[in-house]
């Protein structure tokens, strides 16, 4: 009905609509996920649904994730072509989820894909597309960060930073005087002695580079009923989701709410945003209201935060941030889903996409090959970095002394001393001391 007799009746109808919508989306995800191979008619139906102007972008993004998850179980050329088509969508969230699915499908099923000329032709076209090359480079770095670095960061949090914080018996946060202007000298001495500042600064730098520094924090917050549904691990964060809508303080743009901040934040992935909200809902309402009052407490602080929200909203639309959040969502699913042992964990694999024929042209592009090699070099993946530096020298940079020197250093580190000397000599020939 368009007219409601009471506000309570209206809320009841809205809740029922949200529930029906959620059920329909979940059923769509599950139907796609467990499907084997699409028939021509099923493929056509999927394309019609994806191109419909009546379907919300959030729902379509869940559909794209379902196709990707299905492909990771069994190869289907029609589903792969669906992802290739989905990548052309103008919405950033959709095309970034699609390219992640394309990359993973090529990684696991390259030999199968090469048997289909139409698919090969489409990939070759993309490999010459500047935007695709840039997007794929970001996906590659983010997959490497998740598969190779997140576990190290998690270990550092559990074994170094958190235990160090717990060592200080005087760190009584409940006894803090918010109005005190002076710093506690005992705390400052402990901070200097413990080296905690350096560790936190290192984590901050890792976060700025796109590393997943919140896995350790949020891994304990995936026990809520919400996460029992497999599709929910791939939900884009939506403040109107039925169970968290009550946290909203309305649509007043002049107000700063916790949901506004979460919605625009590029720091937390979608899964962690839901975890945060469900944790908030377990708090007494008085504490939630107090947090809200603190956000809106001081006018100057509020204005500054509003500006920050604008900046976050703009950066949120950038493909790099969208794909990073999605990769983090994938990582949490494969590491934390209650039935994760029934499926293959993709993040236990090397995920070296650049070694795949279908993707190497884009990832070894002259504008990105050195960036990829530098990433591997700085993260001590020396053998792979050395191979890429060699490839870069061979293809584009035979007169680049710095690359010869970096490659020489790598061969020295891994014990190939004769080769290292040859590379150092070549570097000296190009730029003699």
Annotate each predicted stretch with a short phrase.
Residues 235-430:
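Alpha-solenoid helical-repeat scaffolds
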Residues 66-70, 105, 375, 410:
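Residue-level signature for tetratricopeptide repeat
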Residues 14-15, 48-55, 69-73, 85-92, ...:
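Solenoid-like repeat scaffolds
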Residues 18-26, 55-64, 76-77, 91-97, ...:
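Generic helix N-cap/helix-start motif at coil->alpha-helix transitions
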Residues 1-66:
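Extended repeat-based scaffolds of very large eukaryotic assembly and lipid-transport proteins
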Residues 21, 33-43, 71-80, 338-350, ...:
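Helix-turn-helix repeat elements of alpha-solenoid scaffolds
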Residues 132-305:
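Non-catalytic protein-protein interaction scaffold segments in large eukaryotic complex-forming proteins
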Residues 43-48, 78-85, 113-127, 154-160, ...:
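Alpha-helical repeat scaffolds
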């Amino acid at each position: 009905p368009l007219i409601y007799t009471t506000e309570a009746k209206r809320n009841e109808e809205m809740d029922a609509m949200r529930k029906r919508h959620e059920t329909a989306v979940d059923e769509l995800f599950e139907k796609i996920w467990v499907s084997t191979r699409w028939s021509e008619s099923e493929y056509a139906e999927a394309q019609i649904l994806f191109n419909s102007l009546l379907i919300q972008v959030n729902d379509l993004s869940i559909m794209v994730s379902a196709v990707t998850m299905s492909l990771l179980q069994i190869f289907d050329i029609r589903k792969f072509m669906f992802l290739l088509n989905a990548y052309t969508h103008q919405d950033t969230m959709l095309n970034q989820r699609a390219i992640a699915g394309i990359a993973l499908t090529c990684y696991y099923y390259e030999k199968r894909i090469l048997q289909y000329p139409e698919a090969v032709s489409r990939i070759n076209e993309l490999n010459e597309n500047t935007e695709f090359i840039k997007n794929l480079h970001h996906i590659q770095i983010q997959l490497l960060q998740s598969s190779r670095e997140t576990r190290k960061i998690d270990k550092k949090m559990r074994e170094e930073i958190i235990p160090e914080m717990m060592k200080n018996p005087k760190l009584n946060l409940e006894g803090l005087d918010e109005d005190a202007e002076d710093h506690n000298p005992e705390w400052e001495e402990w901070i200097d002695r413990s080296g905690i500042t350096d560790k936190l600064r290192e984590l901050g730098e890792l976060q700025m580079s796109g590393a997943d520094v919140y896995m350790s924090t949020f891994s304990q917050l995936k026990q809520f009923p919400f996460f029992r549904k497999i599709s929910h691990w791939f939900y884009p964060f939506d403040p109107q989701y039925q169970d968290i809508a009550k946290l909203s303080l309305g649509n007043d743009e002049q107000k700063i709410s916790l949901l506004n901040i979460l919605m625009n934040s590029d720091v937390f992935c979608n899964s962690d945003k839901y975890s945060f909200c469900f944790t908030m809902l377990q708090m007494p309402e008085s504490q939630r209201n107090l947090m809200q009052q603190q956000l809106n407490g001081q006018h100057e602080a509020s204005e500054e935060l509003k500006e920050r929200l604008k900046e976050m909203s703009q950066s949120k639309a950038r493909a790099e941030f969208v794909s990073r959040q999605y990769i983090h969502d994938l990582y949490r699913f494969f590491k934390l889903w209650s039935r994760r042992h029934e499926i293959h964990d993709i993040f236990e694999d090397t995920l070296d996409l650049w070694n795949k024929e279908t993707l190497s042209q884009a990832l070894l592009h002259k504008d990105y090959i050195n960036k990829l090699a530098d990433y591997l070099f700085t993260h001590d993946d020396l053998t792979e970095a050395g191979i890429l530096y060699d490839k870069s020298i061979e293809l584009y940079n035979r007169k680049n002394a710095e690359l010869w020197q970096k490659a020489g250093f790598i061969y020295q580190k891994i014990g190939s001393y004769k080769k290292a000397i040859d590379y150092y000599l070549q570097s000296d020939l190009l730029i003699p001391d």
